[in-house]
Amino acid sequence: MFTEGTFDGRITANLASALSRPVEEVRKAYFAKVEELELGRWGLDTFWEWIQQQLPGAGLASSEFRRIFLSSVQENAAMYDLLPRLPDSVELGLLSNNYPELSTLLRADPRWSRFRALIFSNELGHKKPAEQAFLALLRGLGCPAEHCLFVDDVLENLEAAAALGFQVLQYREHQTFTAGLTELGLL
């Protein structure tokens, strides 16, 4: 929700372009092991080494892969603009299926200082929709699920949160989302 479109789609397209390879070929290699990043088992260098093994002749330096990877983030400005508009009484937490280095950059970004809990899958070792991920978020927030609104763009994650007692709101389009927040008295 804080990024436009899908990061994975953008990184694989950008990488395919840099390698002059078909995007389908790059995506096959990327998606076969991206969970290793999401769960924090691998760093970017190990991930890139594995991709290179799957794509013989992919002669890109690790530093260039890292640059392409990190520059593929496209922020959803509307979500960042929304943060200061939320009342101070609304406590925020983030549960993100994320990657090493990206989570480090997010933690360093002052716009995230409003969040009481920042839970990243690569640091936790569990990702949405696993129950352990949601329980870590609740521990970070220090409140029961019944007092929390979980927002996500993936239905499977919303269903998992609802099963644990969270109220849920799906993020599809920003205006509809903010209307939903207004309806709930949060804006």
Please place each PLM-identified region on the residue numbering.
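Active-site neighborhood of HAD-like aspartate-dependent phosphohydrolases
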Residues: 1-29, 163
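Alpha-helical elements of Rossmann-like donor-binding domains used by nucleotide-donor carbohydrate transfer enzymes
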Residues: 10-14, 32, 46, 50, ...
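Short, surface-exposed acidic
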Residues: 19-29, 56-67, 186-187
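A metal-dependent, Asp-based hydrolase signature
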Residues: 35-65
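Short, acidic loop-to-helix structural element flanking the phosphoryl-transfer center
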Residues: 60-93, 131
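Asp-based, Mg2+/Mn2+-dependent phosphohydrolase catalytic module
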Residues: 99-187
